Structures are given as structure tokens and as C-alpha cells.
């Protein structure tokens, strides 16, 4: 055997010098081998989807060059060398089919791999022949490399003898398996080197033989060392010799990863330059098989043949130089395909591979110095005795503990010299290196040497921790936290033994940084690397330092946020040795982007950080004056540096793309130094290393290194923001508003904003009534930011001329309050009053330039509403809350120029409840019903408490809905932004689990200054966070660093400068309602009086009317079927589905009495139930409908006519209005009322126990007046409502309106008719919700046609749902106080509820508009009430007319009280006055 002349043994020795151990080439023993032909085993892919499209890649001409060889050109697949992987069917990712007789022989495994590979190629080349694995001739159980020669010769013979193969012309794919099982990478012995040389020469000879003998061949050289080594971890294979004992004193993950990479590179370079790749008909390509990049516990081991075959195939599809050989689970299941651009198998030539020796390896100057400009470099006048008055110049000794980032691995390596990552450049280490000076190398020691040139302990040059150059840098490359205590022990011993220092007297700085390697390995052993074990290891090390080292300031550098490393790894345009990266940190880089494992890792990272802070903040290391540990969070939030093109910038990393280079060490040193000078609690936690920051200097007012004790700012905050400049010129857009542009600050809200009890001392309950407005989080301006943290004090750091803030104490009318117009106890309904006062003050105060000054207004409301919601859940409904808030914001939007409005969530009442009830010794529990009844008094797990939670969520949802409607984003100089930091507030608790009352005022309800400080910081942070990424949690005990604007993002964030699109509202699937009522029980006995009738007493429902009650057109059905009556959806009588999906009166009543009967379902006549309405019915048809209804009731066997209470709803008049113009004389009001009266008389005479709703006819003319051309079928309107043909005729429409009002007026008297009051079991109640019918508008202020059918005439199912809600709510409102307008704003919680105090359906008598029966005077009273009501109706109608007429003209002068959605009309006021007068 000869080597190729151009490759000497010296070339192979390169592999040895790179650290490779002996290579074992294993052949087949020949024993127990299946006969090659007769016992051929056929392996197949089962149920595996083939993703490639071979036809697109086909060529009619066979390739003449191996460098353009396509899979379709291959005729035969073969292999020599045995992979020796034990079979494990089912262990891989793809199922195999094989006969049961197959045994675990090496030959079998080889055939399995080749068969699968052949099956893949068969999709491209159907004529591919059956694969072959050449058997060896040896007889030993473990054969030597010579057997590979036997297999190679046997293979060549078989290929030549194969009659189906054209040996000279057909292309062959040959795989050569070999393995190097020695794991000794760094220090092979002389014997091992000799052994390896001999075997590699043999392997080279085999390749030379194939090159000489086999034309047209593509040879894969496959090293299965890694696969075999992994299998040996699980079981002894019986086919491979055990690895030789490694004589190295130590090996690390880093060294193994680097040497494995070097091994691959050496093969690549050797083969690329060899004769094997110089010709057109032959090529040898090294196919690396490294470990998978996934947690060891998830690996499928041993590997099955199918997986190995896929890995060979996929490697052939990757260009040389880009073959990482690293796969996660998902990738192992994926078959790669040739691309149209590169449809061939990759060789060194067609991959444009550049050998490493040709790559630039010049040593680049990576060091980065800094300018030092601090003027005061003096030490203390005398050596300090306390660590809390320690100046930088007092430091005499420096040391460090940690891992390879502190050891400096690769810090000085040139970009291409990956081997140099193994060099520990300790002199460049960020925290303890001392090479050169600060001008050329930036490190913490070099900064400190500017203060004290005699500093000792820093490391210089390169070397291990055991070398003298390391000095007190005892960091160990590859170290994990469980090795930290050993480092601490070693450091203490070194310091004590050093005769050049005074161990007892010299002040020391020791920096500890550990945890990255724990995180990188944590997914393989979550117990060992749990957050608790991590912090226990930290504690053990710090305990040693605390116990033994005097005069020490310890920097505990927080573990780095490690997941940004994924950005570098996943960026395809960045050239990194990904196999090294994957080995160094498999837990970070081997997980899917949205996997649970990655989420767990991110949480573990945070828990490491959190527990570190908890340990240090516990005070464990603050028991002596001469020792402290301070958390330095410079690495807590680290952004991946990026190039100007936006890709991760590898120039910040060592050649392995994992460790820091000298530039990053320098910038880390500056960040650490800055942290050391920043007060505890106000340290910079986010660093962008792209920007080279200057070296900061000690503050003359505070020249000491910051400790917990000397950083005690109380409730103040340290301003660390550098970008504080205003815009170059005053901005005209709220979306380009900088903090320094704000000139006015204001606030609205309740007692929290007013500042009640902020500074009240514990136990001084009466002082909670004091309004400490100067300390209020959103509006207070007492003292300065260093003493009092509030939003105004933060803004004053940007603009010292800020105005509007409150100071001292006082109520909203005091001069101290200024523009803080919050009022204690204020509810949402009071907000408009505050807004008007605020607007007036801003307009009239000469300190405010109303039109030019930019304003920030903070609004917080809702807590007081929840305190009282249970007293009247209808009044405090979410719908009303929404309306009140909208009305207030509407005024600001209309009246106030240049304003950014912060809408702040209220604190969840559950927090207040927990604090209050779990501290009975400190909180005034006996006064809970007075302080906040509906929050504090419900029992645990009660229905009342569940309702509180439901109302809370509804309020919060209303706020979000209002802001995200875009209603307040129509002007360039105004925006409302929801700041959600209070959405998920964490209860502050003590170590014993009790709520921490130190955050609360003496009443345990209001918040003290400690809590307000956190609110201000959180609000400010929210203002700088983009929409969609705002923090929606608050931990009062957590650290909230002061957020800062940046050069890239200098603006207060709005929807536009956040590039945020309000989410499209999901399609509403149904128009159901949520049922929140608790009072659902019937009367204890069946009532005999209609005036004591509860909803649950109702047994029968019925209805009379026209197309509205038949629900004609409620669902789309096309033009020809427009007249379909959807009775099951009818507002007053439909019973389809359930309340949660279909809001109808019967479905509401079913919640009180599930056995109710009479309702309609579906569309068929026989399912109409007691719905006797007819589509075209008019008033004249009501007597006939009444007779029909009576007959039906009497004939229905399930109805007990005498005993069952019946609810009948009558609505008629729409057709009368639509057709009156055809014969005005026959459509008089008198006739209309007469027919209804006749119908009621029939019911009165025939039916016992009846409650009748008579619904006033809707204001039809107004409803259909301004629809323009938006109707899909306007002709249908004209056909069904001929009077509307004249909608453009003002006189005709006035006549229609007049009749409309007269019909409403006439029917409104029915509630007061004496005839219907004579029976105790009969009542008629007029329900007036349609009296003032307003056209529903959509969010764009256009007509909302979703309330109507396709022809815009009938009501849709949505319209029916809203009618049902309005009717039900009218039934629960006293006569004289009923809502007389429709509110069709969608809300699932608009249904009112009976209460224990008012459980009945309202009649005239139980509305207390009449005296008791015993005192009843003459009938005159019954007529006095309706007369007053009619007069009030006229006033109401005139008001509506005036509003509709004047609104378009006087829109700019419209006041908030003109909004009529939920107003009570004038007739109610008149009736109330009449009652009072009588």
C-alpha cells in the first residue's frame, strides 16, 4: 500500500497534533454472517412522506462530472466498514420493516443503512440496483484495519461481476465507515500516536485503492465515533473495543468541542487538497457525525439504521464547510431535498470550499482601551472601617471567581483561530484582568489602578488558574456553580498565604460570576441544576468569603440572560462553528422556538436571577460593617449586538461565537464599574454593548461604592437616563413626543390619585382622610425625585419647567391640588365633572398655555364603583361604566389640544380584600361595610365574590375595548393609551405568608408612599414600552428599575410609534348574554297579587303583535325568502337555544324558572307556541289576536289557567305607521288606542293571573330617515312601508313623526287606567324603551346595519337581542323611572337583576306612585299621573327633536349632558315631582 505522493505521513500527523486519539477500523468477522445473496435483508421506509420533487430535477443526459452528480444519476449504493450499531427497532424516528429472523450483526446494520439510502435514491433513480455491503474475511471477534482492505477488494470484485451494472459508465455511491473511539483529545501518548498513524495510513490506502480501481464513484467517508461513543454509554455492543484509558489530567466540554471541530477541519482540508478531489470522475467527502443538539435525556440511543441513513443523505445535501452534523429531534425527522439551484451532491469543488490554511488567520488587534477623565482619584483621609464608606482609591486587592468568561477563554483570539479559544487570556478578563493600561485594555482592575496604581491581585497574560500569572483570578473554565465553593476556598487560602498583602487590613474587591454553564446543562439534569441548588451553591461560596475574608466588597454579577445566543446560532448569514456552540450549550440551542422546554429554560434563567437577588437582599451578608455583597445586574437583560444591516454581530465574540472577545470584555468592565457606582435598587439592568460607553465617575456628593446601606434613597429614585433632550422644535404630533417636551401634567380619579393616607402613620386611621396630593404617584410634585418618586418628579428631570403637579395636602379645590382634580370616593359617573373642572383650570391659569403646551393627563377610576356595585348592580354595570368613561374621554378629546392621556387600570379589589381580611389586628375589620362593602364583606368562595370578579373583569374589558376602538386616535395631537401595569398585581407578602401591610395606609385599603413609589416607576416604564409589549404585572416588592428613552426610541409610546395595530375584533358568534343575577328564587308561596310577582313565579309567556314579534327577517335568507318568520329568535317570545347564545325574554326567564312554557321555537307555524303575532298585523287586529291567544291558553293541557302566572307582551303600531298615508282618517290615535284597549279588555275578562307588557311603538321615522343608499334592497322598504317612500318630503315626514308621537302618547296612559287596577291579579305596564329611538352607529360613526335585515327594515337577531334586554330592564324599573330610550351598545352584561330589596316586576302600585289601597281617593289621581307623564313626554320629544336638529349645526358646542344613551326622560321627573306633591 502506498500513500498519495502529495500527502506524506507528516500530513496525517496533523490529525495527531490536533489531538486525535487512535482510530479503530472495524471490519466484519465473517462469522455468523448471512449469505450475501441468499439471505439478503430488505429494509424499507414505512409511512414516511417523501417531500422532494424528483421530476423537477431530472436531466436526460447522465452527468459526466462527479461535481454535478445528481441523485438520479446513481445506479448503485454500497458500503464497506461496519457501523456496528446495535439494532433497536422502534427507537428511531422512522419505523422499519424487517424479518424477525434478523440478528444484531454488523452486516445487518450496514445493510439496513444502505437499503434505506437506496430507497431514497430510488425516488430519483427508479433503476437503482439493490444495495450491497461487502463482508470481511476475518475470524477474530474484533478485527483490525486490515479487514477494511479485504472488504474494499471484495466490493470491487462484486461491482465488476455484477451483470446489471456497467462498471465503467454507471455512477456508484460508496460509503466507507470507520470509527475513532478514543476520547482523549488533548494529550495522546506516543504509543497512541503511533497506533493512530498506522491505522490512518491504512485508511488512506483504502481510499487510494478505490480511487485507482473504481471509476465514476462518489465516496462518503463517515466517522461514527460519536454515534458509537454514545451507544457505549447505554450498553456494551460486543463489536467495539473499549476506549483506551485517557492519560489527560483534565478534559472539558470546551476542549472536546474544539478538538472535535478541529478534527473535522483537518479531514476537510486534507481531503480537499488530495488527489481524490482533483478529477471529474471520483470524489471523497468527509461526512461528520457529531452528537445531536438536544438534551441527553431526549436522545434516541442507540441510533437505528434509518436515522443514520437519513443523516448521511442530509449531509450529502449540505455544502462542504456548512455540514454541522448536528440535529435536533425535528431535523432528524426531516429529509432534505436537492434544490433547483444546487441539484447535485456536494463536493469540495462545487461547495467552493476554502481550506483553513488559506483562510486569513492574521492576528487582529482586538483590545479596546478607554479614556479616563475622573478628576477625584483620592482615597479616604484615613483607611475606612466600614464598607459603606469605601472609595475606589481605598481598594488594594482584587480577585474573582467564576467560569471561562472570567478566565478569559478566547478573549485575545483572532477571528479564525478557533483553537485559540482554549487559551485563557486572563489578563484581558473584564473583572480581574490587568494587561497593559486603561488606554489600551479596559478592565475593572485597570480602572481601579487609575485610583490606586498599587492595586494587587489582578491576572496578566495567559494560563490556567493554577499559574502565578492568574494571581487571585481563580475562575475555572467550564465551572458550574457546584464548583464555586472550591474556588472560594482556594482564593481565601491564596490570599492568606500571600506575604505581599495585609489580609486583615487591605480592602478587597471580589467579583463572582457563575451560572451560564449550569443553564447550558440544566435540561439534562433539572434536579442538579435547579434554581434552588444553584442558589445553595452560591450561598456556600459566599458564606466562605463572609466567614473568612475581612474588609471585602463582593460583586455578585447576576447570571446572564442566555437565550439571545440563539439569535447568533440561528442566523444563517453569520459564519459560526455551530457544532461547537451546540456542544457548549445544548439546552439553549437545541430547543424549538415555541417549545415548552425553551419556556422552562427561560423561566429557569429568571429564577436563577431572582433567587440571587433574594439571597443578597435577605441581609445575610450585611451583618458586619467590613463586608457586603452587592448584586450587579449588568447582564440581566442583554441585547444581542447587531451590525448596521441588522444581523447579529459576531465581532463581539471569540471565534467559537460563544465566549467574549476583548471588546466585549472591555464593555462589560465599564458596565460593571457603572453598576458599582449606582445605588442599590437603581442599577442599570439592560446593556447594549453595541454602544461604547464612557467610564463614569464617582459622584462628588456620593463618592463611595454603592452598598445597600449607603444607597438607602427611601422612596426616591436615582435618575440614570442620558437621553433627556427635548425635540429640536415643539412637536406637532403626539406620536413624536419626547418626555422633555411635556410642559403640563394633570390627573383625574379617586382617592388613590388624590393621595389619601399616603403619608399616614401606622395606627393613625383618622389621618387617612388627609389627601397627600404632593406624594400622589401620577400627579404629586413634593421635593425631588431623589426623595419622592412620582411621575411629575421623573418628568422634571427632563423638563425643569414642568407645571400642573400638586404639592402638599388639600382637596381638589385647594391651590395645592392645581391640576390634580381627583376626588376621594369618585366613581366613573363623576369623571365628567372632574374633566370639566380640569379643562376650565387649564384654560384659565396663566401658567398653562392651553393651546401650545403638551400635556400628560393620567386617568384612574373604577375602584369606588366596585366598592358599591352590589348595592345596585344595574347602576354600576359594565355598560354604564363604559358610558361614563367614554363621556369623560370624549370631552378631553374634543376640548384639549396637545394631550397624551394615560388610562390606568385600577388595582384588582382582591388585593385589597386579602390585605384587609388577613390582618385583623392591624386593619379596621369592623368598619369594612363602611369602607368598601361590596369588596370586603362577601364570604370566601361565595357567589357574591364571584360576581365581584366578573364585574372587575368586565370593567377592565370595557377600558380595553374603549381604547382599542380607535375612537381617540383621530387627531394628530391627541391619543389615549391604556397603561396596564396594574392588570395583574401581586399581593406583597411577608415570609410567614401574611400580606405585607407596610405597603398600605392604616385603613389597609389605601396605598402608602412605598406603594405609590412603585406605581410611579411602573407607570413611567409603561409609558416608554410599545403597545403590544407593555408590562401588565406589578410586584410591589420587586425591583422596578427606572426606564429610560433611547436614541432609537426617544418617544413616549403610542399606537402609531409602536407600529401597533389594534386587534381586529373577533367575529361575534352570537348575541347571547351573561347572567349575573343572584336573586333567582320564586316567592315562598305562589303570589296572589301581581304587585308581588317575581320573575321566577312566571309559568307562561305569550306575545301579540306584528313582524317584530314574528321576528320576520331576523336571519339572512335571500331576497325571495326575506319574509321567513324566525319566531324562535323573537325578542319577547322566542325560546331557541339558551340565554348564552340567544338573548330573548323567555331565555332570560328560563334562568329563573327552567319549566316556563309558551315560547316559540324555530320557524314553523306549529312551533309558534303562544306567539299569535302576524307579520302584517295592525292595531285593529289586536282583539282577534287576543281571542286567539285566550283560546290557545285554554286548550293547552300543560297550562293551569287559574293558577299559573302569565306574562304577555304586546307591541303593535309599526304597520299602522307604515300605511297611515294611504288612508290617514282610518289611522287616528283614538282608533289605535281603542283597538289595544279592546284586546286588553278581552284578556282582562278571560285570563286570571296576568302581567301584561305593552311596549310603546318605536320611533319609526327617525329610525329609517337617514339610511341613504346603504340598504341592500331599498325597494323592499318601500313595499313594506309605503309611507317611507316620502322620506325626502319634509312635510310628509313631519306628519309621520306627529302620528308616531301621538301613538306613543296615547298608549302611555294604559298603565294608569283604573279598569286594569281593579283586580289584584292583573296589571298592564307600559314599557317605553322605544319612545326615543336612536339610530345605532358603528365605531366609524356610520349607521350600524348589523341591527337590521337585508332590506334595512326588519330587525336582525342582534336587534332582537337588544330589544329583549331593553324590555327586561324596563320590567325591573319603577313606573315613572323607566328608561325611555334604547341603548344598543353591545355588552353581554347589560341585563339588570332583581335585588332582595326589590325582587318584583314593577307595576304602578309597587312603584309607589299610588297610595295604599286603604287610603285610595277618587279616580282623579289615576288621571293626574298620566297627564303629567304626557306633558313630560312632550318635553322629552321636543328635546330629542331639538337635539337632532341642532346637533349637526352646533356640534362644536355640544355638551356631555346631551348624550342620551342611558338618560331618564323628563316624564319621569314630572311623575316623581307629582308623587312628592301628593
Swiss-Prot record:
Species classification: Eukaryota, Metazoa, Chordata, Craniata, Vertebrata
Protein's recorded name: Phospholipase B1, membrane-associated
Active site: 404, 518, 659
Glycosylation sites per record: 180, 525, 626, 637, 715, 764, 787, 801, 830, 926, 1227, 1280, 1289, 1387
E.C. no: 3.1.1.5, 3.1.1.4, 3.1.1.3
Keywords in alphabetical order: Cell membrane, Glycoprotein, Hydrolase, Lipid metabolism, Membrane, Phospholipid metabolism, Repeat, Signal, Transmembrane, Transmembrane helix
MF-aspect GO terms: calcium-independent phospholipase A2 activity; lysophospholipase activity; retinyl-palmitate esterase activity; triacylglycerol lipase activity
Topological region Cytoplasmic: 1444-1478
Amino acid at each position: 500500500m502506498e500513500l498519495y505522493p502529495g500527502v506524506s505521513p507528516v500530513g496525517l500527523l496533523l490529525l495527531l497534533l490536533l489531538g486525535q486519539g487512535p482510530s479503530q477500523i472495524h471490519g466484519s468477522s465473517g462469522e455468523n454472517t448471512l449469505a450475501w445473496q441468499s439471505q439478503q435483508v430488505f429494509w424499507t421506509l414505512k409511512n414516511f412522506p417523501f417531500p422532494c420533487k424528483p421530476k423537477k430535477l431530472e436531466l436526460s443526459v447522465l452527468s459526466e462530472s462527479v461535481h454535478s452528480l445528481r441523485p438520479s444519476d446513481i445506479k448503485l449504493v454500497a458500503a464497506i466498514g461496519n457501523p456496528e450499531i446495535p439494532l433497536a427497532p422502534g427507537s428511531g424516528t422512522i419505523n422499519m420493516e424487517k424479518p424477525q429472523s434478523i440478528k444484531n450483526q454488523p452486516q445487518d446494520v450496514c445493510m439496513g443503512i444502505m437499503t434505506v439510502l437506496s430507497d431514497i435514491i430510488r425516488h430519483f433513480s427508479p433503476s437503482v440496483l439493490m444495495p450491497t455491503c461487502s463482508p470481511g474475511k476475518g475470524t477474530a471477534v474484533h478485527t483490525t484495519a486490515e479487514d477494511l482492505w479485504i472488504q474494499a477488494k471484495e466490493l470491487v470484485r462484486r461491482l465488476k461481476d455484477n451483470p446489471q451494472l456497467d462498471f465503467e459508465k454507471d455512477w456508484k455511491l460508496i460509503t466507507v465507515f470507520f470509527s475513532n473511539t478514543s476520547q482523549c483529545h488533548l494529550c495522546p501518548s506516543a504509543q497512541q500516536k503511533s497506533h493512530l498513524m498506522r491505522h490512518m495510513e491504512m485508511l488512506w490506502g483504502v481510499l487510494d485503492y478505490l480511487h485507482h480501481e473504481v471509476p465514476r464513484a462518489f465516496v462518503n467517508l463517515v466517522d461514527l465515533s460519536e454515534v458509537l461513543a454514545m451507544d457505549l454509554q447505554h450498553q456494551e455492543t460486543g463489536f467495539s473495543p473499549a476506549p483506551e484509558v485517557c492519560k489527560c489530567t483534565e478534559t472539558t466540554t470546551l476542549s472536546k468541542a474544539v478538538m472535535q471541530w478541529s478534527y473535522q477541519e483537518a479531514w476537510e482540508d486534507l481531503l480537499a487538497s488530495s488527489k481524490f478531489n482533483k478529477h471529474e470522475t471520483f470524489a471523497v467527502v468527509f461526512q461528520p457525525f457529531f452528537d445531536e443538539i438536544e438534551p441527553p435525556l431526549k436522545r434516541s440511543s442507540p441510533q437505528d439504521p434509518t436515522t443514520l441513513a437519513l443523516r448521511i443523505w442530509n449531509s450529502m445535501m449540505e455544502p462542504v464547510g456548512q455540514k454541522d452534523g448536528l440535529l435536533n429531534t425535528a431535523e432528524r425527522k426531516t429529509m432534505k431535498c436537492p434544490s433547483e439551484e444546487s441539484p447535485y451532491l456536494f463536493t469540495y469543488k462545487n461547495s467552493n470550499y476554502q481550506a483553513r490554511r488559506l483562510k486569513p488567520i492574521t492576528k487582529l488587534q482586538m483590545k479596546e482601551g478607554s479614556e479616563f477623565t475622573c478628576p477625584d482619584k483620592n482615597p479616604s483621609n484615613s483607611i475606612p472601617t466600614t464598607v459603606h464608606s469605601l472609595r475606589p482609591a481605598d481598594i488594594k486587592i482584587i480577585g474573582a471567581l467564576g467560569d471561562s468568561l472570567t478566565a478569559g477563554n478566547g478573549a485575545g483570539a483572532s477571528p479564525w483561530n478557533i483553537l485559540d479559544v482554549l487559551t485563557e487570556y486572563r489578563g484581558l478578563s473584564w473583572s480581574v484582568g490587568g494587561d497593559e493600561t486603561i488606554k489600551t485594555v479596559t478592565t475593572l482592575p485597570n480602572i481601579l489602578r487609575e485610583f490606586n496604581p498599587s492595586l494587587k491581585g489582578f491576572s496578566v497574560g495567559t494560563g490556567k488558574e493554577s499559574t502565578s500569572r492568574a494571581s487571585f483570578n481563580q475562575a475555572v473554565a467550564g465551572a458550574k456553580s457546584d464548583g464555586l465553593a472550591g474556588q472560594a476556598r482556594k482564593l481565601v487560602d491564596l490570599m492568606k498565604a500571600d506575604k505581599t498583602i495585609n489580609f486583615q487590613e487591605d480592602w478587597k474587591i471580589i467579583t463572582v460570576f457563575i451560572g451560564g454553564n449550569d443553564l447550558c446543562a440544566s435540561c439534562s439534569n433539572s434536579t442538579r441544576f435547579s434554581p434552588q441548588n444553584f442558589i445553595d451553591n452560591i450561598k456556600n461560596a459566599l458564606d466562605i468569603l463572609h466567614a473568612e475574608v475581612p474588609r471585602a466588597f463582593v460583586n455578585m454579577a447576576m447570571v446572564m440572560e442566555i437565550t439571545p445566543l440563539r439569535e447568533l446560532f440561528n442566523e444563517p448569514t453569520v459564519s459560526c462553528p455551530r457544532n461547537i456552540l451546540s456542544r457548549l450549550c445544548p439546552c439553549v440551542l437545541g430547543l424549538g422556538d415555541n417549545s415548552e422546554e425553551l419556556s422552562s429554560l427561560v423561566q429557569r434563567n429568571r429564577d436563577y436571577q431572582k433567587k440571587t437577588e433574594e439571597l443578597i437582599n435577605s441581609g445575610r451578608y450585611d451583618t458586619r460593617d467590613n463586608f457586603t455583597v452587592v448584586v450587579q445586574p449588568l447582564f440581566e437583560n442583554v441585547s444581542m449586538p447587531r451590525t448596521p444591516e441588522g444581523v447579529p454581530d459576531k465581532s463581539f465574540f471569540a471565534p467559537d461565537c460563544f465566549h467574549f472577545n476583548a471588546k466585549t470584555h472591555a464593555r462589560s468592565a465599564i458596565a460593571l464599574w457603572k453598576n458599582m457606582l449606582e445605588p442599590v435598587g437603581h442599577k442599570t439592568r439592560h446593556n447594549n454593548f453595541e454602544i461604547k460607553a464612557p467610564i463614569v465617575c464617582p459622584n462628588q456628593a456620593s463618592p463611595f461604592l454603592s452598598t445597600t446601606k449607603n444607597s438607602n434613597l427611601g422612596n426616591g429614585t436615582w435618575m440614570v437616563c442620558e437621553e433627556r433632550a427635548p425635540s429640536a422644535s415643539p412637536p406637532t404630533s403626539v406620536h413624536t413626543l419626547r418626555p422633555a417636551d411635556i410642559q403640563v401634567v394633570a390627573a383625574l380619579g379617586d382617592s388613590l390619585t388624590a393621595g389619601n393616607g399616603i403619608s399616614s402613620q401606622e395606627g393613625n386611621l383618622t389621618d387617612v382622610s388627609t389627601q397627600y396630593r404632593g406624594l400622589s404617584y401620577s400627579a404629586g410634585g413634593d421635593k425631588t425625585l431623589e426623595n419622592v418618586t412620582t411621575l411629575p418628579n421623573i418628568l422634571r428631570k427632563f423638563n425643569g419647567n414642568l407645571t400642573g403637579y400638586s404639592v402638599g395636602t388639600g382637596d381638589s379645590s385647594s391651590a395645592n391640588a392645581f391640576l390634580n382634580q381627583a376626588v376621594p370616593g369618585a366613581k366613573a359617573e363623576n369623571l365628567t365633572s372632574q374633566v370639566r373642572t380640569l379643562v376650565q383650570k387649564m384654560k384659565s391659569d396663566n401658567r398653562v398655555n392651553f393651546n401650545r403646551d403638551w400635556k400628560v393627563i393620567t386617568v384612574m377610576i373604577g375602584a369606588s364603583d366596585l366598592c358599591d356595585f352590589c348595592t345596585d348592580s344595574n347602576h354600576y354595570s359594565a355598560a354604564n361604566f363604559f358610558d361614563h368613561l367614554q363621556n369623560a374621554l370624549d370631552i378631553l378629546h374634543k376640548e384639549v389640544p396637545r394631550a397624551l392621556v394615560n388610562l390606568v387600570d385600577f388595582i384588582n379589589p382582591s388585593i385589597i380584600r386579602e390585605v384587609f381580611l388577613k390582618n385583623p389586628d392591624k386593619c379596621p375589620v369592623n368598619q369594612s361595610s363602611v369602607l368598601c362593602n361590596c369588596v370586603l364583606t362577601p364570604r370566601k368562595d361565595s357567589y357574591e365574590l364571584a360576581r365581584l370578579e366578573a364585574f372587575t373583569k368586565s370593567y377592565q374589558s370595557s377600558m380595553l375595548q374603549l381604547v382599542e376602538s380607535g375612537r381617540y386616535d383621530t387627531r394628530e395631537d391627541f391619543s389615549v393609551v391604556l397603561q396596564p401595569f396594574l392588570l395583574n398585581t401581586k399581593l406583597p407578602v411577608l415570609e410567614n405568608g401574611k400580606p405585607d401591610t407596610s405597603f398600605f395606609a392604616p385603613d389597609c385599603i389605601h396605598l402608602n408612599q412605598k406603594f405609590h413609589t412603585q406605581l410611579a416607576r411602573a407607570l413611567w416604564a409603561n409609558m416608554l414600552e410599545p403597545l403590544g409589549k407593555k408590562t401588565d404585572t406589578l410586584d410591589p416588592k420587586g425591583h422596578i428599575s427606572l426606564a429610560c428613552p433611547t436614541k432609537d426610541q426617544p418617544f413616549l409610546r403610542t399606537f402609531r410609534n409602536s407600529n401597533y395595530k389594534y386587534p381586529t375584533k373577533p367575529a361575534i358568534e352570537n348575541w347571547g348574554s351573561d347572567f349575573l343575577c343572584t336573586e333567582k328564587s320564586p316567592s315562598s308561596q305562589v303570589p296572589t297579587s301581581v304587585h308581588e310577582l317575581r320573575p321566577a313565579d312566571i309559568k307562561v309567556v305569550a306575545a301579540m303583535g306584528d313582524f317584530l314579534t314574528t321576528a320576520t327577517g331576523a336571519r339572512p335568507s335571500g331576497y325571495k325568502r326575506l319574509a321567513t318568520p324566525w319566531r324562535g329568535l323573537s325578542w319577547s317570545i322566542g325560546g331557541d337555544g339558551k340565554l348564552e347564545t340567544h338573548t330573548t325574554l323567555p331565555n332570560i326567564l328560563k334562568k329563573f324558572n327552567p319549566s316556563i312554557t309558551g315560547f316559540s321555537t324555530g320557524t314553523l307555524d306549529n312551533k309558534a307556541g303562544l306567539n299569535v303575532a302576524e307579520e302584517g298585523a295592525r292595531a285593529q287586529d289586536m282583539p282577534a289576536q287576543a281571542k286567539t291567544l285566550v283560546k290557545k291558553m285554554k286548550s293547552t293541557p300543560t297550562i293551569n289557567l287559574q293558577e299559573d302566572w302569565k306574562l304577555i307582551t304586546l307591541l303593535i303600531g309599526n304597520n299602522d305607521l307604515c300605511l297611515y298615508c294611504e288612508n290617514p282618517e282610518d289611522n287616528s290615535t283614538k282608533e289605535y288606542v281603542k283597538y289595544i284597549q279592546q284586546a286588553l279588555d278581552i284578556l282582562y275578562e278571560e285570563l286570571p293571573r296576568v302581567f301584561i307588557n305593552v311596549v310603546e311603538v318605536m320611533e319609526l321615522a327617525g329610525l329609517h330617515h337617514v339610511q341613504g343608499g346603504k340598504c341592500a334592497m331599498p325597494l323592499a322598504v318601500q313595499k313594506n312601508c309605503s309611507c317611507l317612500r316620502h322620506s325626502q318630503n319634509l312635510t310628509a315626514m313631519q306628519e309621520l313623526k306627529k302620528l308616531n308621537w301621538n301613538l306613543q302618547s296615547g298608549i302611555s296612559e294604559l298603565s294608569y287606567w283604573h279598569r286594569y287596577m281593579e283586580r289584584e291579579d292583573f296589571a298592564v305596564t307600559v314599557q317605553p324603551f322605544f319612545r326615543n329611538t336612536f339610530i345605532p352607529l358603528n365605531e366609524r360613526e356610520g349607521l350600524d346595519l348589523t341591527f337590521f335585515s337585508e332590506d334595512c327594515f326588519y330587525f336582525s337577531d342582534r336587534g332582537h337581542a337588544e330589544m329583549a334586554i331593553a324590555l327586561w330592564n324596563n320590567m325591573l324599573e319603577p313606573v315613572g323611572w323607566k328608561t325611555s330610550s334604547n341603548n344598543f351598545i353591545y355588552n353581554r352584561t347589560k341585563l339588570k337583576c332583581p335585588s332582595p330589596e326589590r325582587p318584583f316586576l314593577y307595576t304602578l302600585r309597587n312603584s309607589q306612585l299610588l297610595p295604599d289601597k286603604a287610603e285610595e281617593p277618587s279616580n282623579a289621581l289615576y288621571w293626574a299621573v298620566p297627564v303629567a307623564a304626557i306633558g313630560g313626554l312632550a318635553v322629552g320629544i321636543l328635546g330629542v327633536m331639538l337635539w337632532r336638529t341642532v346637533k349637526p349645526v352646533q356640534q362644536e358646542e355640544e355638551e356631555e349632558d346631551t348624550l342620551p344613551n342611558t338618560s331618564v326622560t323628563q316624564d319621569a321627573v314630572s311623575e316623581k315631582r307629582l308623587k312628592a306633591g301628593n
